[in-house]
Design a protein with these regions (language model features):
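Ligand-binding loop in jelly-roll beta-barrel domains
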Residues: 73-98
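Short, Lys/Arg-enriched, Trp-marked, Pro/Gly-tolerant hinge/linker segments that flank
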Residues: 113-124, 138-149, 158-204
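Amphipathic, well-ordered alpha-helical segments in soluble domains
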Residues: 42-45, 126, 130-133, 152, ...
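Generic protein-terminus/edge-of-domain signal
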Residues: 1-67, 74, 82, 99-111
């Protein structure tokens, strides 16, 4: 596929009708994912596999338990090595949730043009514990399921914001590469999602 054609086919994917939704996925596929965007925010928690995640011109080389913040309308795609299984948690978050303070990390990721959270071992264990409890709660039919699930979601997002806003993560320049040409095209697309995004327009 030609360089400009990759971006002319950018489309909105996924629909979210609740405040948040958690997925735990493990698969092995040869499918190539096109650049796309969502109307909601997304957190990707990478567990295992060989994946390069492209967000707005940056290509992140992921390590186990890396976390990615994908702002709504941010154009992104995953580049997956099909030779090994790819396991991850995906958290979708509605833009109009009651707790707007929890969206600050996405806004800051957009401002910094940096989306990766790489944790030290102590913080990694803390976030793992909350995440696994959240997953268990979403699958439970026990008393107070909705309240417990919501409280665990809030815990996870509060800690995620603290870590990112206070820069408690490990910053490693070798963890990503940056392509200014791609970044310029994606920036144009991001500001013109309802306009003509044909190959001719993008390559003009």
């Amino acid at each position: 596929m030609l360089f400009s054609e990759q971006f002319s086919q950018t489309e909105k994917t996924g629909y979210l009708n609740e405040d948040f939704r958690l997925f735990h996925i493990k698969d092995q596929t040869k499918k190539e994912f096109a650049y796309h965007y969502h109307d909601f925010h997304k957190v990707v928690i990478f567990i295992s596999g060989k994946v390069v995640y492209h967000i707005e011109g940056k290509a992140y080389q992921l390590r186990p338990w890396d976390i990615l913040l994908v702002n709504r309308h941010a154009i992104h795609r995953s580049e997956i090595d099909p030779s090994v299984p790819y396991e991850r948690f995906i958290l979708w978050i509605q833009n109009d949730i009651l707790w707007q303070e929890l969206l600050k990390c996405f806004q800051k990721a957009n401002d910094r043009n940096y989306n990766l959270i790489r944790l030290n071992s102590a913080l990694q264990e803390k976030m793992k514990d909350i995440l696994f409890e959240l997953e268990t709660s979403t699958k439970s039919d026990g008393y107070g399921k909705e309240i417990l699930t919501q409280s665990l979601f809030l815990q996870f997002m509060v800690y995620l914001n603290r870590i990112f806003l206070e820069k408690q993560y490990i910053f490693d320049k070798k963890s990503y590469t940056f392509d200014s040409q791609i970044a310029c095209i994606l920036q144009y697309i991001n500001h013109n999602l309802k306009e003509d995004l044909s190959v001719e327009t993008l390559s003009a």
